[in-house]
């Protein structure tokens, strides 16, 4: 496993954070993608990698359901996939340990949640190595129960004029970890949950690969709970 700059806390001087290093390894950055359903995020990442727009390889797909349609995307791309069903485990910790043991065996550098609907406990060796995308601007419309169309329904019910998506590091609370980047999407007067979801997903398709590119390039640096993007 390579040393990746964003894993370790940054050093501090009086006026903030400095010392951004870069990874010396030139081997492809290895991702595990966690899915629960249709795998639209997985498909987007496969397409970006195939087009040369993301310098990474998907080493493993982990699905929480044997019937997840996203498993077909993994099969089509000849990506190893495994099903880890929550019902087969007595506790969340046991379920989580099984997922991350598969990730260890696959030698992944980063775990990417792509519509993964099961809560996991992130082990110490994967702290700041799990990322998630949420279809709203955290800290709004997020947390337990806010997923899928429920998010967009809440946005419309509240009457906000701007929504969007947030890529963040995952921790052991829902939609809580440090924010890497966000993209804004205007809410239109005639929007429905379906039309709004479609536009937010288009923003997600650009934001997630961009966040991964920043991580892979070693440009993501922590300053307390804030994420700073170092110059290229």
Residue ranges of each PLM-predicted region?
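One-carbon transfer enzymes
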Residues: 2-232
């Amino acid at each position: 496993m390579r040393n990746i700059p964003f894993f370790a806390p940054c050093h501090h001087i009086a006026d903030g954070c400095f010392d951004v290093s870069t990874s010396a390894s030139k081997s492809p950055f290895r991702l595990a993608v966690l899915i629960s359903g249709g795998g639209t995020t997985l498909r987007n990442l496969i397409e970006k990698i195939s087009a040369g727009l993301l310098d990474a390889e998907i080493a493993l797909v982990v699905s929480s359901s044997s019937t997840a349609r996203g498993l077909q995307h993994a099969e089509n791309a000849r990506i190893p996939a495994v099903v880890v069903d929550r019902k087969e485990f007595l506790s969340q910790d046991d379920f989580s340990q099984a997922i991350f043991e598969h990730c260890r065996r696959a030698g992944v550098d980063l775990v990417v949640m792509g519509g993964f609907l099961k809560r996991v406990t992130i082990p110490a060796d994967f702290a700041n190595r799990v990322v998630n995308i949420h279809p709203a601007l955290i800290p709004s419309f997020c947390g337990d129960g806010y997923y899928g169309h429920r998010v967009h329904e809440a946005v419309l019910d509240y009457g906000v004029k701007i929504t969007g998506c947030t890529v963040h590091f995952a921790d052991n609370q829902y939609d809580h970890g440090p924010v890497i980047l966000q993209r804004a999407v205007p809410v239109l007067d005639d929007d429905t949950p379906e039309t709004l979801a479609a536009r937010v997903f288009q923003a997600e398709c650009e934001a997630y690969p961009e966040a991964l590119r920043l991580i892979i390039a070693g440009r993501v640096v922590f300053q307390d709970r804030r994420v700073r993007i170092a110059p290229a």
